[in-house]
Amino acid sequence: MYGIEYTTILIFLISIILLNYILKSVTRIMDYIIYRFLLITVALFALTRAQNYGLNLPITGSMDTVYTNSTQEEVFLTSTLCLYYPTEASTQINDGDWKDSLSQMFLTKGWPTGSVYFKEYSSIVDFSVDPQLYCDYNLVLMKYDQSLELDMSELADLILNEWLCNPMDITLYYYQQSGESNKWISMGSSCTVKVCPLNTQTLGIGCQTTNVDSFEMVAENEKLAIVDVVDGINHKINLTTTTCTIRNCKKLGPRENVAVIQVGGSNVLDITADPTTNPQTERMMRVNWKKWWQVFYTIVDYINQIVQVMSKRSRSLNSAAFYYRV
């Protein structure tokens, strides 16, 4: 009987010793794996960081300056330039290699091949619905058209400024504008915006809140509309929600990495949204040529002077980001 008990105790002790040995072995193996993994991770991180030195160098002075990466032999420029032009330009030029030709010309001004991107848009109206300004510097060419003068002004006001925007639920709430920097911006394939100003008893001023036909129309069948109403007064808003969206926006200030080149027209458009703001013409320029080749030649010739009145910014613009924070 005692022999069986001693045997059981002995087996139990041996099991504990064996388990302790196994645990120590596993611990040593895990420590080795973890330390090796950390060593490899640190080494890769150091190499990766070294390859990126110089990518975020600030630009000081002329765009002719190029920077060399300290761990790579390639010469590169830290900035990109996007040139937005209407379909009319490529149609008139009618040359399959015209972009390559212009790239070679930009090269003589200090812009390496691959740093200049050409973006085509069908019309000012369509471009205003989905502006995409992703480069460090963005030049938008707009052919002057008297019938589209207001559309051009609104588009320029949109892309030359930064906006902080929030969605509006016009089915549940009334809205008012707090100041001249506060605007309602609607976008879509067809935007018709009507408003009914309200008094302190929420009764319509010159309109009936239950009758949309009595509302005041401030935009009709537009793709982009920047709506300005009397500040400090609640408004009930009616909108074609199936084809349009509307956002409550505040103008924060100039978007300094964008410039607009107006092609033609007697004067540069004044994009000022209200009479108390000084006209913004520094980044709104005009060239007056009939042929698009001449327009592009002029831009290449003066590209570095144009960039000097701009500032490189990291914030991009598209129709989705614009709604919330640009």
From Swiss-Prot:
Keywords: Calcium, Capsid protein, Disulfide bond, Glycoprotein, Host endoplasmic reticulum, Host-virus interaction, Metal-binding, Outer capsid protein, Signal, T=13 icosahedral capsid protein, Virion
InterPro entries assigned: VP7 (IPR001963), VP7_1 (IPR042207), VP7_2 (IPR042210)
Location of the region described as CNP motif in the Swiss-Prot/TrEMBL record: 165-167
Binding residue positions for Ca(2+) 1: D95, G206, S214, E216
Post-translational modification summary for this protein: Intramolecular disulfide bonds.
Keyword flag Glycosyltransferase: no
Glycosylation sites (chain numbering): N69, N238
Gene3D superfamilies hit by this protein: Glycoprotein VP7, domain 1, Rotavirus outer-layer protein VP7, domain 2
Region of interest (GPR motif), ranges: 253-255
This protein's GO CC annotations: host cell endoplasmic reticulum lumen; T=13 icosahedral viral capsid; viral outer capsid
Cysteines paired by S-S bonds: C82-C135, C165-C249, C191-C244, C196-C207
Keyword set includes Oxidoreductase: no
Binding residues annotated for Ca(2+) 2, in chain numbering: Q177, D228, V229, D231, D301
Localisation per UniProt entry: Virion; Host endoplasmic reticulum lumen
Main location: virion
Leader sequence segment: 1-50
GO molecular function, one term: metal ion binding
The protein's role, per its UniProt record: Calcium-binding protein that interacts with rotavirus cell receptors once the initial attachment by VP4 has been achieved. Rotavirus attachment and entry into the host cell probably involves multiple sequential contacts between the outer capsid proteins VP4 and VP7, and the cell receptors. Following entry into the host cell, low intracellular or intravesicular Ca(2+) concentration probably causes the calcium-stabilized VP7 trimers to dissociate from the virion. This step is probably necessary for the membrane-disrupting entry step and the release of VP4, which is locked onto the virion by VP7.
Sequence similarity: Belongs to the rotavirus VP7 family.
Subunit architecture: Homotrimer; disulfide-linked. 2 Ca(2+) ions bound at each subunit interface in the trimer hold the trimer together. Interacts with the intermediate capsid protein VP6. Interacts with the outer capsid protein VP5*.
Note, other: Some rotavirus strains are neuraminidase-sensitive and require sialic acid to attach to the cell surface. Some rotavirus strains are integrin-dependent. Some rotavirus strains depend on ganglioside for their entry into the host cell. Hsp70 also seems to be involved in the entry of some strains. In group A rotaviruses, VP7 defines the G serotype.
Protein name: Outer capsid glycoprotein VP7
Species this protein is from: Rotavirus A (strain RVA/Human/Japan/KU/1995/G1P1A[8]) (RV-A)
Taxonomic lineage from the root: Viruses, Riboviria, Orthornavirae, Duplornaviricota, Resentoviricetes
